[in-house]
Amino acid sequence: MQLKEQGLLEQRGRKLMAPQRDTEQFHSAWLLSRAMQETVQRYAVVLRVLEISQTISRGQLEKTSRKIAERLSSLYGMSSPEFYDKNVFSCLVTALREQELVISTEDGTLKHSDNSRALQADINQLVWPEISQHLLQLESV
């Protein structure tokens, strides 16, 4: 595992842990987690929209996800415009389809697969708690 080899994760018994806080490796791991957080949050948004909608067109999934991401950005101070960029969401949905994490129905709409539900459960543990709470409060899109 490269993260362990680089000292960004440490094995302690059966657990993988962050390095000690006063180390350069901890700072590097923290920077990496910050860089990845927006990507993880975008996945959480798209997967939540899929969950709420049951089935949805690709265009509507991207549009709705962008609107939610833009709202999250303004609420939680994420100042990078690429957080809710149209092309980023388009690529994300394409990747989900290519990896068969979402299913294309006969009428061309998209829906959750068993794999995307498992991914969603994992992703929800990684996003900031306030983002997760906000997404859970969405009842319709």
What spans do the regions from the language model cover?
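Membrane-interfacial terminal anchoring regions of lipid-handling membrane enzymes
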Residues: 1-141
